[in-house]
Structure formats: structure tokens, C-alpha cells
Amino acid sequence: MSKSPILSSRTLVLIVFSIAINMLGGQISSMIKLPIFLDSIGTLICALLAGPWIAVLTGLLTNLLWGLLSGPIAAAFAPVAMMIGLSAGLLAHAGLFRTLPRVILSGVIITLALMLVAVPIRTYLFAGTTGSGADFFVAYFHAVGENLLESVAITVLGANIADKILSALIAWLLVRRLPLRAQQNFPHMARVR
């Protein structure tokens, strides 16, 4: 029995579908200036169905395409999207997407992992402001005496912990609801029960 290729046609369709979910969620959040992003649900779905490397690729392609369509800010955050995909995929394959408490814990861990990349990008490339709804919080913490790095770190933690827990829950619920026949199309799928 031969192993199926990691980039099957189904996986490529999953990547395209996931990029669309990411961009739709991110655009809606951006248009109404929510302090969360909702731009990684598709990446998390990829992490659960196809593993960390497909999720990394999905995050990268999402942000590069988004950067071409809307401006360079999204492209600058491609390493963050890649970290989200990598950490979610590794957590999923370690069994941390099997129960509700584990999914919530995964959202927290993903947030801590992405902070290693997002805080320096937001601080040093954009001086704390990127045009998102979270800019208000950076300005507030900076105005009450925190330095810029601390203001950005607090804001990134606050905005992303809620966002990544919510995104992880949505992705987990969607993947759990897939019929068994659909799940069998993804041989690298993590266990979600």
C-alpha cells in the first residue's frame, strides 16, 4: 500500500478554501474594526485536516495574497500566520484538539507562540499601529505609561487570546461535524474526538 501524497488535489482544494475563509473572516473583522482578527480559522482547519506544514503553507499564501490585494501590512504578518499554522498543527497531532478544554488550551498556546513573532513585527515595523481595531488598545496602554513594546505585547496577547480561542473552537467544531467519508479524504488528519 502506498502512502498518499501530502499535496493531493483534495489538499490543494482545502488550501484554497481555507485561504478564502481566512480572508473573509479577516475582512469582516477589519471592516467593522473588531479588536480581534478572525483571519486564521481556515489555517486552523488545515492544521486539523492536513497537518502543520499544509497549515504553514496556507497561512503564508493567505497573507501574501492578502498583501497583494489590500496592501503590504498583511504580507508583513505572514510569519505570524505561519507560526499559527505550525503551532496549531503540532498541537493537533499531539492530541490537544480532542476535547473542549484542550481546544481552549490550544488557543492559549497558539497565542503565546504567535506573540514571539507578532510583537516584534508590530512594534518595530509599524510602531504599534497597523490600522486594526487593536490600535486603540496600544494607544491607551502607551498613554497610561507603558512603553511601546509592553503596550504592543499586552494588546497582542489580549486581542489574540480571545481570537485564537474562538478561531480554534470554530475550526474544531467544523472539523468534528465533517462526515466520516469526508474525513477519510485527509490521511494526515489529527484526531478531534
Residue ranges and their predicted role:
Residues 31-33, 72-76, 97-193:
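Membrane-embedded alpha-helical hairpins and interfacial helices in multi-pass inner-membrane proteins
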Residues 44, 63, 85-89, 119, ...:
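Transmembrane alpha-helix boundary and packing residues in multipass membrane permease domains
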